[in-house]
Swiss-Prot record:
Belongs to the FBPase class 1 family. It comes from Pseudomonas syringae pv. syringae (strain B728a). Mg(2+) 1 binds at residues 90, 112, 114. This is Fructose-1,6-bisphosphatase class 1. GO terms for cellular component: cytosol. It is an enzyme of class 3 (hydrolase).
Length: 336
């Protein structure tokens, strides 16, 4: 049986589901950029890419060298093809306008170029997260300047989302709104090959991921829920749970898509003005789209994440996503 490459899969989607050719091209360009990022990550100290830049991004986070390198790879790969009207990145203060010398396209690309970059120096998994939106008609004119408002669309408006994870293998996990597929990079071929055809999250689980060092800062509903998880079979949930934490959302979510589980990053009391740590546009929305398409659920503790109307490019949210049964339980505790 012949292997199905990402290119073949996307062409077949164009034939069977009328996936637009420009969207197909965009996904292929993002995938090529992810291969380049994977190559840079794999070089590590040999490529002189470890360590920090000595600068901070708009979030106030210290930028690693690979954060900046990955951001530039994605910008340069996508700016010239004529399929995008603009881009936005966790590493940039403002939206990126496609240079005037290139044609503008119908889509917007939003990305976290290197999620989990604190793992780089310890050789643990990192990844790239991306989301594709349609550009509002009023910004499609070649002469119309793009601004932040064009990107402020709820997650339900995403036409595609995915991530690449750079671990023992490099994988690209993708949804076009019709289920979730996983592609593994065959380095000899230089192509992503379909290896996970129908990724589905079990409804129930006995595994959760949360940073327990923040426990003292959590709100009461989170304290209650996590204490019940830790109580195991002697507690109200009547079963034992294992805890996992990789400190990279892309790695924790990949595990959940592979075998089920619950990922939590609750809001806490340290910065009451901020509703969470993770970014809605770059992290929560694309991951929520993937998780829902795989049969899971995703909320901020009160409402479905994909229904949130963004108010800013770098807006933060609390996140509970994964196996539906546990997401619904955690959300119910917030509403009690």
């Amino acid at each position: 049986m012949s292997r199905v490459t990402l290119s073949r899969y996307l062409i077949e989607q164009t034939r069977s589901n009328n996936t637009p050719a420009d969207l197909r091209f965009l996904i292929e360009v993002v995938a090529r950029a992810c291969k380049e990022i994977s190559h840079a990550v794999s070089k590590g100290a040999l490529g002189g890419v470890l360590g920090s830049m000595g600068t901070e991004n708009v979030q106030g986070e210290v930028q690693k060298k690979l954060d900046v390198i990955s951001n530039e790879i994605l910008l340069e790969a996508n700016e010239w093809g004529g399929h995008l009207a603009g881009m936005a990145s966790e590493e940039m203060d403002n939206a990126y306008q496609i240079p005037g010398k290139y044609p503008k396209g119908a889509y917007l690309l939003v990305f976290d170029p290197l999620d989990g970059s604190s793992n780089i120096d310890i050789n643990a998994p990192v990844g790239t997260i991306f989301s594709v939106l349609r550009c509002p008609n009023e910004y499609l004119s070649q002469n119309e300047a793009l601004n932040e408002k064009a990107f402020l669309q709820p997650g339900t408006e995403q036409v595609a989302a995915g991530y690449a994870i750079y671990g023992p293998q490099t994988m690209l996990v993708l949804t076009l709104g019709d289920g979730v597929k996983g592609f593994t990079l065959d380095r000899e071929m230089g192509s992503f090959v379909l290896t996970h055809e129908d990724i589905t999250i079990p409804e129930s689980t006995q595994e959760f991921a949360v940073n327990m060092s923040n426990q003292r800062h959590w709100e009461a509903p989170v304290q209650r829920y996590v204490s019940e998880l830790l109580a195991g079979e002697d507690g109200p949930l009547k079963k034992n749970y294992n805890m996992r934490w990789v400190a990279a959302m892309v790695a924790d979510v990949h595990r959940i898509l592979t075998r089920g589980g619950l990922f939590m990053y609750p809001r806490d009391s340290r910065e009451p003005s901020k509703p969470g740590k993770l970014r809605l546009m770059y992290e929560a929305n694309p991951m929520s789209f993937l998780v829902e398409q795989a049969g899971g659920a995703s909320t901020d503790g009160h409402q479905r994440i994909l229904d949130i109307q963004p108010e800013g490019l770098h807006q933060r949210v609390a996140v509970y996503l994964g196996s539906k049964e546990e997401v619904e339980r955690a959300t119910a505790y917030h509403k009690a």
